[in-house]
Amino acid sequence: MNILEYPKFIRPLISVFLCIASIFLSLAGRPTIPHGRELDMSKFELTWSDEFDGDKLDLTKWDGHYYSDGDTIIRRGSYWNNSLATVSDGSLHIATKYYPDGLNGNGKPGWYTSGIDTSRSYEQQYGYFECRCILPKGTGLWSAFWMFCSGVGKLDHDGELGAEIDIYESPYYHLEGVDGNSVASNIHINGYGEEHRTKSVCHSRVTANNPYEEFNTYGLEWNEKGYIFYINGVEAGRTRFGVSEVPEWMILSVEVDGANGEPADGWA
């Protein structure tokens, strides 16, 4: 995973790229193949990275999202615990497992997985953020690489106080054919109540490699004018909606569809 920022002397220009066919397909709810500009990495400088070397999660960089190391919390249809996030062979592995007696016999039977973030160690405003990953295979599994800050819950703003930036989300394994090989990129602002506002930026097919078997790269270029989303270095979508003007931290997570620790009906 690499995080970069613009050198101070660079002010990238945002150009508008429109494709009528792509717009029609998006409105129909079908994923589209990324077709925009290629990512220009020459305008960035590396500021942070984790190659997941070694044999355990680096806790100087990562902590549990909404929980501390060793704790267990309910997250939608499962439980989150850091023990399900392990490191080996130069990769982070977030497992999803069923424990009939609960994790370590804690009396909470159910599915367990994990979500980790950099909230205590690193945050950044503007730049390029990416992860290279294989998506989890399973109906009801929902992996994501996203950004967040405390201002997301604040109301009466247009994103400048903070936004949930979903660089990629992968809830589509259950779909048949090529539609299942897709991810979504979304923006959320103004909390999650009645004043919540959201923008679905793109629903993209992943075509270079099978996303459930091979690595692909999912990236975000974020600047003062907007967000540009990339898959394998090719633009998938862009928006000026809800541009955050504050530093945000990164999250890597897997969730099980459902609520209160119970999977949704039909999940298997």
Regions found by a protein language model. Give the residues of each.
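Bacterial Sec-dependent signal peptides at the C-terminal "C-region" and cleavage site
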Residues: F17-R37
